[in-house]
Amino acid sequence: MVDGRGVPLSLVVSGANAHDSTLLGRALDARVVAAPKGVEQNVCLDAGFVGKEEEVTTRGCIPHIRPRGEEALEMVRNPDFKARRWVVECFHSWLNRYRKLIPRYEKTDLSHGGLLKLACAMVTLNKVIVIYG
């Protein structure tokens, strides 16, 4: 889970055969940065999370679930519309820069999770440097 600028907020490690929607609750619970008091947290999700709105709202967030292609149509209709989900794809590409992570050679989830957390910390540091100079 990342914020609007691509800074990681939570990380959940699972097998490749687990669907993302089954990990939604764990990802929301694992957030390391909470929203400021009085500010509603918005969560943008893709079509794979249809039916998970209640799980998001029970954790105090507002779900925004768009079917595939609807975001692109909205960009054509409204030139001021800003896409949101591409930030997650950029974050994945930043993680892929750390060649130790792909392919996975670590035997335990603990060691692989530690390397992922280190990579997330490096991405966060780079984003802070870019944003704040």
Q: Which residues make up each language-model segment?
A:
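Generic alpha-helical structural context detector
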Residues: 29, 93, 116-120
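Residue-level signal for inorganic ion chemistry
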Residues: 24, 46, 118
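Active-site beta-loop-alpha junctions of metal-dependent nucleic acid enzymes
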Residues: 12-35
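Helix-centered, glycine/charged polyanion-binding patches within enzymatic domains
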Residues: 37-108
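Short, acidic, Ser/Thr-enriched surface-loop or helix-capping motifs
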Residues: 3
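C-terminal domain-tail junction helix/linker
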Residues: 112-133
